[in-house]
Amino acid sequence: MRRALVPLVAALVLIAPESAAIAIGPPDPGDVKPQIVWKKIPFGATRKRQMARYSERHYGERTYHLTDPQVVVEHYTDGTSFDSAWNHFAANGTHLGEKPGVCAHFLIDTDGTIYQLVNLRIRCRHAIGMNWTAIGIEHVGTSADAILGDRDMMRASLRLTVWLMSRYGISWGNVIGHAETLQSPFHEELYDDWRCMTHADFNRGEMRIFRRRLKRVAGRLDVPIGAGPHWVDSGC
């Protein structure tokens, strides 16, 4: 009986590596998810209706739902206080004559703590032309240089962004700065007066640094990075 087991054991040893190789694939998004603290802003029925109407006016679709996001937009708050930014997003104030007020899905504090403010199934008004398909990440700070030079904030931001890439299949080329939105192939704005509006936070040069680091972190975590940036002429 013992002699009969020897060929069987040898066969299993030969089969095991091939089976293991077949099982290798992208990591489970939960395996790369960083620690996130929930600190929800009010986003009840009224704000959802406002977001749905905003979407109808600007994107031609009456919904507040964010489905299959294709882009991550990086921002900074142009301030030094987490509480000030959170309160501004929570207030749901009128912006450019319209509601809902501005917000972002995530807000990263200066100590590197990641706060989630809004459910990822809900559209947030954080970047003109992009809210229909983009997740917004805000960083507490007054310049991209300061954030890029802050180890705690960068570690948190890169891990968060890589997790979102893994979860939604977003390519590294569609991780963009607010200042790059007009050249994104996903930019869509029905209001002519708004079509060329954007902000200056995280410009092309700053995002080259960010994306270079992002690829390194994604590589270490075995997260597929997809295609690089594909810019379009906005005509602006």
Language-model regions, residue ranges each:
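Bacterial N-terminal signal peptides that target proteins for export
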Residues: 1-6
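Bacterial N-terminal signal peptides
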Residues: 7-16
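N-terminal catalytic cores of peptidoglycan-degrading enzymes
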Residues: 20-128, 235
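Basic/polar, cationic surfaces and motifs that engage anionic cell-wall
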Residues: 24-47, 143-236
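Solvent-exposed, acidic/flexible segments
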Residues: 67, 99, 130, 146-154
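Soluble periplasmic/extracytoplasmic beta-strand elements of cell-envelope proteins
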Residues: 73, 105, 136-138, 176
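Substrate-binding clefts and substrate-entry loops adjacent to catalytic sites
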Residues: 121, 136-149
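A structural motif
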Residues: 129-136, 206
